[in-house]
C-alpha cells in the first residue's frame, strides 16, 4: 500500500468519497500540510520514523476531526524530529481549531503541546493542571517521574 492509498482509505471508508480527482486533491493537500507531498507514491517501509508520524497526522487531519488523539507522537524519535512533531501538532491544532488529547511519556512533548496535563500513575489521577503547576508539586512519584 502506498502513502496515497493509505490516505485515501479513510476517505473512501468513512466519507464515501470515490471520485479520483477529489481523492487526489484531498490527499495532496494533506501531505502538503505535513511537508510530505513528495512521498505520495512511497511505501511505509521507505519512510523514516518521523515521516511515518507525519503520515499518521495527515491521515487523521484528512477527515477534519474536532478532536485529535495522539498516542506517543514522539516515541522512538530523535530530539530534533520530536521537536518538529511537537511543532506540527501545535500548528495543526491552531490552524484547524481542534482539541488534542496527547498520551505521552515524553515530558518535552507534554510541556510543549499541552495547555493542561493529567498525570496518571497506575490508572490513578495523581494531578491535573498546567505544566507549571505540575512542576510545583510535592508528590514524590511525580517528582521522580518528571526528574526535577
Describe the residue ranges of each PLM region:
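A short, proline-enriched helix->beta-strand linker immediately N-terminal to the Walker B motif
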Residues: 62-66
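Helix N-cap at the start of a conserved alpha-helix in ABC-type nucleotide-binding domains
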Residues: 79-81
Amino acid at each position: 500500500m502506498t502513502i496515497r492509498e493509505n490516505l485515501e482509505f479513510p476517505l473512501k471508508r468513512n466519507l464515501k468519497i470515490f471520485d479520483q480527482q477529489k481523492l487526489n486533491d484531498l490527499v495532496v493537500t494533506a501531505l502538503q500540510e505535513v511537508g510530505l507531498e513528495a512521498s505520495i507514491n512511497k511505501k511505509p517501509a521507505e519512510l523514516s520514523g518521523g515521516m511515518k508520524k507525519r503520515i499518521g497526522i495527515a491521515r487523521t487531519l484528512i477527515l477534519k476531526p474536532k478532536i485529535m488523539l495522539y498516542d506517543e507522537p514522539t516515541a522512538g524519535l530523535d530530539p530534533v524530529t520530536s521537536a518538529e512533531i511537537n511543532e506540527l501538532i501545535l500548528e495543526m491544532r491552531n490552524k484547524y481549531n481542534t482539541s488534542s488529547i496527547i498520551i505521552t511519556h515524553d515530558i518535552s512533548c507534554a510541556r510543549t503541546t499541552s495547555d493542561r496535563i493529567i498525570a496518571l500513575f497506575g490508572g490513578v489521577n495523581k494531578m491535573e493542571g498546567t505544566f507549571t503547576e505540575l512542576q510545583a508539586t510535592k508528590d514524590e512519584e511525580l517528582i521522580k517521574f518528571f526528574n526535577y
